[in-house]
């Protein structure tokens, strides 16, 4: 009988901390549904106390996820734990994940607490979390730089208080695999079967996956990871790499296995990339575009003669279908519906109808509509806030010797408003003109153009990060078009709509508190 290592996915919480990876509630719901389809044991849906948006997303995910455990992060503070408990209340299976720093440097300079005070706080946090849920996880932040004697002391104390999972994070990605393995082995010998040991490894030295795997070999039975290795700084351990390493190297891992349906790995990777706008590098293990590509003639010849000559796993094992059907303008609604289900989306009939209309419009302009085109069509709609402003027309004059100018028409409250303006470049002219029409000034922090597919008729996705109020966080806007300028204008208008939606949500939250 297989010994299961639980997969704890934190794409929606830690993964979202990747620069530019911010997601709205509907996007998070789509990813959560796909993670459940993938077979993830625990979905860390967010940090409930962080913002009204995080709280709302966790609550809505808790309402739709049925099989996976839904988890919220919480500092070892009563207000955080209360928010987490309330956010995950609707979940069929729920967990609160509370944490406090345990390294000398963190306790002294960040917490400004003595070790015995930290233990007391941790125990009280676990006890309070138990009043909301049965399943409580406790993390020793910066465990990689903590003293072993203190780690054992605080871990045994929180287990006594009711923690069922103990997470050992390598918060700054400092440990080497043999060090991580030795630490987990010693802790496992101390804890034995009183709690599950989990690891959460960061990739600052490129060792997150190796550290996670060595931990599993030494007693860890939960691994915290993200799709495509997303995460702040250099990212987190990549789920797909951990799972496929365990699956592929049975000579090392023996009866150890996961509950992951590996055929959903590639669809999940593509969905996350489409929603976040962050593509895995081409040579990324397992899910990169070159992972199953063989350019060398010798390699190609070998693979054609026998697949296992140069491939240790099959593309089909991760759900990469090299013979996937490509849709076009003659494709019907039934084929389109089947395709979006295969791509991991869960849409209502009304949403399918709207998506099909956009697909037909795109198919009239493109000979072939790829899977990535369809992903972008749908995720672009999911990413969109309610359309207070809507782009209707765009005309640009980008002559080589003159000053770039743009004429923009925007619809607001049923009326069309047109204005024209100049800028330091075409994009600047478009954005300044939109600012003048709406009366809201934005500051562009980031601008990305993503070629969704290949060829002259490739679909372009533009992602912008804009600050409209220095006292509020930047907002993300997405735009999609064969014309990059139109996609840019749509993205900027989308960011403005997101800003308005965020203001309305904050206002509603304040009204509820009053």
From Swiss-Prot:
Q: Where is this chain's protein located in or outside the cell? A: Cytoplasm
Q: What is its EC number?
A: 2.3.3.13
Residue span of region Regulatory domain: 390-514
Q: Name one GO molecular function term.
A: acetyl-CoA C-acetyltransferase activity
Cysteine pairs bridged by disulfides in the record? none
Catalysed reaction(s) here are:
3-methyl-2-oxobutanoate + acetyl-CoA + H2O = (2S)-2-isopropylmalate + CoA + H(+)
Question: What does UniProt give as GO cellular component?
Answer: cytoplasm
The record's keywords, sorted A to Z, are: Amino-acid biosynthesis, Branched-chain amino acid biosynthesis, Cytoplasm, Leucine biosynthesis, Manganese, Metal-binding, Transferase
Classify the main location.
cytoplasm
Listed pathway(s)? Amino-acid biosynthesis; L-leucine biosynthesis; L-leucine from 3-methyl-2-oxobutanoate: step 1/4
What the entry lists under SUPFAM superfamilies is as follows:
2-isopropylmalate synthase LeuA, allosteric (dimerisation) domain, Aldolase
Q: Where is the Pyruvate carboxyltransferase domain?
A: 5-266
Instruction: Enumerate the cofactors the protein uses.
Output: Mn(2+)
| Chain sites annotated for binding Mn(2+) | 14, 200, 202, 236
Entry's Pfam families? HCS_D2, HMGL-like, LeuA_dimer
* Source taxon at top rank: Bacteria
Its function, per the record, reads:
Catalyzes the condensation of the acetyl group of acetyl-CoA with 3-methyl-2-oxobutanoate (2-ketoisovalerate) to form 3-carboxy-3-hydroxy-4-methylpentanoate (2-isopropylmalate).
By sequence similarity, the record places it as follows: Belongs to the alpha-IPM synthase/homocitrate synthase family. LeuA type 1 subfamily.
- Name of the protein described by the UniProt record: 2-isopropylmalate synthase
């Amino acid at each position: 009988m297989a010994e299961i290592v639980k997969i704890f996915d934190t794409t929606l919480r830690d993964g979202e901390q990747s620069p530019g990876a911010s997601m709205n509630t509907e996007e998070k719901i789509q990813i959560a549904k796909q993670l459940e389809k993938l077979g993830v044991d625990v979905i860390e849906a967010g940090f409930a106390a962080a913002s009204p948006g995080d709280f709302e997303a966790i609550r809505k995910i808790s309402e739709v996820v049925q099989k996976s455990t839904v988890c919220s992060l919480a500092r070892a503070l009563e207000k955080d734990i209360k928010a987490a408990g309330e956010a995950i209340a609707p979940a069929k299976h729920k967990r609160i994940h509370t944490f406090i720093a345990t390294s000398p440097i963190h306790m002294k300079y960040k917490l400004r607490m003595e070790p015995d005070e930290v233990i007391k706080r941790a125990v009280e946090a676990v006890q309070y979390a138990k009043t909301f849920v049965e399943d409580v996880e406790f993390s020793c932040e910066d465990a990689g730089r903590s003293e072993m004697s203190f780690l054992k002391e605080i871990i045994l104390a929180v287990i006594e208080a009711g923690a069922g999972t103990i997470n050992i994070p390598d918060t700054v990605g400092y440990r080497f695999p043999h060090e991580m393995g030795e630490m987990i082995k010693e802790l496992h010998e101390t804890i034995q079967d009183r709690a599950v040991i989990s690891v959460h490894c960061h990739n600052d030295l490129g060792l997150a996956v190796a550290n996670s795997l060595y931990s599993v070999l030494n007693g860890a039975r939960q691994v915290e990871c993200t799709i495509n290795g997303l995460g702040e700084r250099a990212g987190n351990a990549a789920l797909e790499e951990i799972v496929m390493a365990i699956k592929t190297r049975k000579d090392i891992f023996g009866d150890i296995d996961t509950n992951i349906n590996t055929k959903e790995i590639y669809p999940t990777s593509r969905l996350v990339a489409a929603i976040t706008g962050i593509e895995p590098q081409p040579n990324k293990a397992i899910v990169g575009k070159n992972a199953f590509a063989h350019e060398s003639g010798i390699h190609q010849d070998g693979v054609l003669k026998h697949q296992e000559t140069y491939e240790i796993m099959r593309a089909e094992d991760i759900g990469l279908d090299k013979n996937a059907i490509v849709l076009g303008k003659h494709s019907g609604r039934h084929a389109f519906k089947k395709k979006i289900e295969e791509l991991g989306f869960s849409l209502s009939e009304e949403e399918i109808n709207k998506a099909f209309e956009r697909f037909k419009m795109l198919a009239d302009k493109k000979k072939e509509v790829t899977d990535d085109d369809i992903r972008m069509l749908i995720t672009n709609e999911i990413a969109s806030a309610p359309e207070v402003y809507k782009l209707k027309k765009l005309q640009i004059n980008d002559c080589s010797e003159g000053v770039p100018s743009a004429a923009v028409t925007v619809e607001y409250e049923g009326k069309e408003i047109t204005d024209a303006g100049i800028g330091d470049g075409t994009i600047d002219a478009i954005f300044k003109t939109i600012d003048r029409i709406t009366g809201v000034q934005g500051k562009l922090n980031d601008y990305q153009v993503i070629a969704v597919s290949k060829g002259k008729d490739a679909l372009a996705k533009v992602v912008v990060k804009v600050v409209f109020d220095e006292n509020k966080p930047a907002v993300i806007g997405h735009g999609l078009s064969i014309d990059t300028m139109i996609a840019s204008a749509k993205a900027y208008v989308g960011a403005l709509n997101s800003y308005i939606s965020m203001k309305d949500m904050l206002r509603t939250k304040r009204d509820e508190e009053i």
